[in-house]
Amino acid sequence: MKVLALVYPGMTLLDMVGPVQAWSFLPDYEVQYVWHRPGTVLTDCGLGVQATHSFEDAWTDPDILFVGGGAKPTLDLLSDSVAIGFLADRGSRARWVCSVCTGSLLLGAAGLLRGYRAAVHWGAREALSQFGAEPSSERVCVDRNRLT
């Protein structure tokens, strides 16, 4: 199973670690941590996460595309057309598109939640609806192949 996990400056480490740890128990699990370029990316708590791949050299056909949240850093990333374009491209080919917390906003900006029900931090529900998603108050929302 090939998982692409977006890492970005200021992201909430907990949002990524929980899902990635759970997936690591699956057979044939592989993960690529992606950002503009390989290297250390500092999270919200100051702990560095290693981006193993750039957008250009990441898998084109992941089983799972995953995005965690990060409050203001997530909002800042909404204006990064390269990152949003990467999510749109890989998400259109992924078997599953997944997010935690405000990561749903990034999926929404990439057009990946249009017409889907999706969970997001309660403070971002109105913003999520602007991307054509139907915000859900569920803590975990599954709509077809979208898990938020």
Report residues per predicted region.
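A conserved active-site-flanking secondary-structure segment within enzyme catalytic domains
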Residues: 113-140
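Beta-hairpin (beta-strand-turn-beta-strand) motif
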Residues: 70, 102-103, 112, 123
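Conserved anion/nucleotide-ligand pocket segment
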Residues: 145-148
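Extended, subdomain-level signal for the structured scaffold at the beginning of enzyme domains
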Residues: 1-97, 104-108, 134-137, 141-143
